[in-house]
Amino acid sequence: FLCDKYGIYLEDEANIESHEYYYGDASLSHPEEWKKAHVARVMEMAHATVNNACVVIWSLGNEAGPGKNFVAAYDALKAFDATRPVQYERNNDIVDMGSNQYPSIGWMRGAVTGKYGIKYPFHVSEYAHSMGNAVGNLIDYWEAIESTNFFCGGAIWDWVDQSMYNYEKDGTRYLAFGGNFGDTPNDGQFVMNG
């Protein structure tokens, strides 16, 4: 990893995300028949990057519910590597550190004063999703983060613009996104980040 070479801290996140069922009762994090899949994905992540010094935090996944399958995944991960803290967005009861996604600046300022009784250390597990002309308040986040010793930063979503070049009939190059190829349905310009 270039992160090892240049000293960039990395949070490695298991490939578990299920927006469709998210945090409701239908979340795949609850049924017993999905437990092995949750544990396997978390352990595959850990085995792949355990020897990379840049990986300082493990993440059980993203936006996939609060169920017992994540407890099993956490237990397996800690048995394999107890040296790194584990986080899972919003589901702070089963992990080592607190997290939240896209908190408002007001929420951040309240958290700094102990208003919400959150688990520490704490980090913003997803923020700075630079859609269009966004992230003008990034300095406000960092003023809150740096105002205390229990906030430990945040994870930028996404680190890359996911659009791709396409060409007009006259050869003019432009950044294309959903719908530019006649594809339906699509997510429009959701990939135009940063």
Please give the residue ranges for each predicted region:
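Substrate-binding/catalytic cleft of secreted carbohydrate-active enzymes
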Residues: 1-191
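Small-molecule pocket liners
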Residues: 194
